[in-house]
């Protein structure tokens, strides 16, 4: 485990993800037309966990995809021509779908902006909603999460780490000073 203070243990993470799943269902009145897209890599694992809960609650399949934002990041443009590009896998149409974009930690908003650009290059959804396990504040862009597991105000020097087990299930959220 990383050094720091555990702010969500395994049980707390499970409760937060279950609550997020229920909030998604309430906001969207079920799963019809709903898809989840996780941001590589932590967001992908969390999206799969949320989809499992949605499917358990609703008894219906919910498509899940993943998006890599490497080519959309604004902090690397022109600076790193040989960035390793991960896989974007969205094996379904986004046209007119309600997309829930999932990430582990919301900080400046720049990752989310990049992910929205990538999603729009794959189609025009009816709407994009944002689900995050942790919102730590310090936004640089006008972006907010629709579904939040835990708000954790931090200093700029602190970091939030979401830890995963060998099966890519979230185990803890740690505040590192």
From Swiss-Prot:
The keyword Iron does not apply. It catalyses: UMP + diphosphate = 5-phospho-alpha-D-ribose 1-diphosphate + uracil. A motif (PRPP-binding) lies at residues 99-111. Its EC number is 2.4.2.9. PANTHER family: BIFUNCTIONAL PROTEIN PYRR (PTHR11608:SF0). Regulates the transcription of the pyrimidine nucleotide (pyr) operon in response to exogenous pyrimidines. Also displays a weak uracil phosphoribosyltransferase activity which is not physiologically significant. This is Bifunctional protein PyrR. It comes from Geobacter sulfurreducens (strain ATCC 51573 / DSM 12127 / PCA). The gene is pyrR.
